[in-house]
């Protein structure tokens, strides 16, 4: 997993509350368990004017010019600014996969659904909770200034605006450690590889019958 320390990027404002995971990545695209291939269908129902289905050539689909992701001023955005209860609905991990593959590494909102919030950390993304008033201010600034950028500093736990205003945010120390060091569940397990090997060797010595090959 890619480590996360500090990110500065263009902000894309998604001014909708209660965005659920089926809106983030619709259910018809969930047939794969690979983490890739979902970015082109992020917010598919809003992003395109036709009905999406797996395997189609998205470059030939009619886009919705009114949807925020399709506006030229937000192309290349890496920070998503959202409203309350972002990521609600079903617990599909495909939602952070789609956001990440599109290019978002940071999502800022007044609140998140718990499972989505946890899944972000497991996939190298930083979900930041700010107050509703702070998020309102960021929406106002973003809409008023084309190319508006923010800096998310995980080490210092602050969001920094272009004028130097800092908004502090809370993050669990363990999750912070994992993001800063690029550790997902597999990475954390591999850190204990020597202890695992020692345990297996001890088990083979104490209970050798468990490790015998079973023949039909």
UniProtKB/Swiss-Prot annotation:
InterPro entries: 3-IsopropMal_deHydase_ssu (IPR004431), Aconitase/3IPM_dehydase_swvl (IPR015928), AconitaseA/IPMdHydase_ssu_swvl (IPR000573), IPMI_Swivel (IPR033940), LeuD (IPR050075). GO terms for cellular component: 3-isopropylmalate dehydratase complex. The gene is leuD. Pathway: Amino-acid biosynthesis; L-leucine biosynthesis; L-leucine from 3-methyl-2-oxobutanoate: step 2/4. This is 3-isopropylmalate dehydratase small subunit. It comes from the Bacteria. GO terms for molecular function: 3-isopropylmalate dehydratase activity. Heterodimer of LeuC and LeuD.
């Amino acid at each position: 997993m890619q480590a996360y320390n500090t990110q500065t990027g263009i902000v894309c404002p998604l001014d909708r509350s209660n965005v659920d995971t089926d809106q983030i990545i619709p259910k018809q695209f969930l047939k794969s368990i690979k983490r890739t291939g979902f970015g082109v269908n992020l917010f598919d129902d809003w992003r395109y004017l036709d009905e999406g289905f797996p395997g189609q050539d998205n470059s030939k689909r009619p886009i919705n010019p009114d949807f925020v992701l399709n506006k030229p001023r937000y192309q290349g955005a890496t920070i998503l600014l959202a409203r309350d209860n972002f990521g609600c609905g079903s617990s599909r991990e495909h939602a952070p996969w789609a956001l990440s593959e599109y290019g978002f590494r940071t999502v800022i909102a007044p609140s998140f659904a718990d499972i989505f919030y946890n899944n972000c950390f497991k996939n190298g993304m930083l979900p930041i909770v700010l107050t509703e008033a702070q998020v309102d201010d960021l929406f106002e600034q973003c809409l008023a200034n084309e190319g508006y950028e923010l800096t998310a500093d995980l080490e210092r736990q602050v969001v920094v605006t272009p004028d130097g205003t800092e908004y502090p945010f809370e993050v669990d120390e363990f999750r912070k450690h994992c993001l800063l060091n690029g550790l997902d569940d597999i990475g954390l397990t591999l850190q204990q590889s020597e202890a695992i090997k020692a345990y297996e060797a001890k088990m083979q010595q104490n209970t050798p019958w468990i490790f015998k090959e079973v023949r039909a």
